Amino acid sequence: MKKLVYFYLAAAAMIIASCAQQPQYANRAEKILAEINDPNSEYVVVISHRGDWRNYPENSIPAIESIIRMGVDMMELDVKMTKDSVLVLMHDKTINRMTNGKGLVSDITYDSLMTFNMRRAHNVTTDSIKVPTLRQAFECCKDRILINVDHAQNYYKGIVELAEEMGMTGQVLMKGKKSIDQVAADMAPYKNNLLYMPIIDINKEKGQELFYDYVNRGIVPMAFEVCWKENGEDMEKCVAEIKKMGSKLWVNTFW
């Protein structure tokens, strides 16, 4: 009987010790970010391009909610600004493809935009789904999933101020091909900035120059998005350097 008691006590102690060693995260988004920033993590981060556009309109709140239920780690969304300076989710310059209205986003006020309904796949107009604001998208994603804001450069000030107001600067990512110094200058006016990832066209001279500027200056971003048309020495060396420096590799698998 004593041996049995000792066995259960030892097992309980092992479980407690194991639990104590597990990192504690405030929310799911924080856990995903920790996996990305851990150079030893083999976790594969899954990013959804404009949300679940097969079942809902792309860049819509239902499309975001759907991928969160699926367990996706990051939502890629696109931003445009209305005539009255409201940031909304839209990939195209016009609303023609994604709503039952017509016109440039920049020529339409937010209230006017709300009179139209969004379209899903096969040009089917929904009964009530509206183009969401960036604020609404942030509210939906906060603490639940990371966000990659595409087409963000022209609206960086508004995006970073909104993210800071909502306590989400560490949850929102933007990417680009600007030089290290240009990125630093763009971010200098702000106390808290968005996460940043360089895009590297490794088969092109400018892409190689940008990548090896990071390497030679010892600057390690959270990840590199590497684009290439041909496999070869350029790509192999790039991937090897990324592994060596402890960063991560972002690959677009849908192309």
Predicted regions and their residues:
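Phosphate-group recognition and catalysis centered on beta-loop-alpha active-site segments
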Residues: 19-255
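Bacterial Sec-dependent N-terminal signal peptides
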Residues: 1-29
